[in-house]
Amino acid sequence: VLGQNGEGKTTFLRTISGIIKPLSGNYNYAQGIKTAYFGEDTYKNITANDTVLSYLKKHAKQGLLHQELLTLLGSFLFSGDDINKDIKVLSGGEMARLSLLSAITQCADVLILDEPTNHLDFETVEALANSLKDYKGTIFFTSHDRTFTSLLADTIIEIKDKKISLYSGDYETYVYKAKLEALKEEEEEIKFQNNNKNIISENKNSYEDRKKIRNRLSKCENLLKEYE
């Protein structure tokens, strides 16, 4: 889910996770579908008097082996004595990583992640994206990390000007299509300016002005041909 700050990405994710009610419209999941949500402040709800490992065991889907949990914890920078730390002594970053891992190991049908990479280093971000590629369910997420988005996304939901646009394909495909649309819009604007005598006329614009406009139009047309 992409969009500028303030466009409503978090509101959208919190709505489809059931945390808040829709401002308008409605949505429905099929019967029996389970969701799991991770948000930037989700970790603040962790109050259990557990260790890192015991907390994860309580919240992970039944059937995950002990060694699998240890491997997952290691990939989230919990190793050695860290897994036996009391939750109450964890830092904010550690709490966020544990909360994220807890959401993932629930193995829900729909996993909803709001900025999951904020407390992860580059190697962990890449490892998380690669591991989620094999997730047996649907993942909705928003992230400012381009590497994570490029590795994981196969469909882009863009929120812009209170409207939602759907782009099939990965992040690179989205960027390509977005640039193409921007070029087409600029081409139409330049054509309008070039043809509208109220804006551009032989009497009111110098030769250099008209030359610049023609060059911009030619450049846009060449780029459009290249993209297409």
Predicted segments, located by residue:
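ABC ATP-binding cassette signature C-motif
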Residues: V1-E228
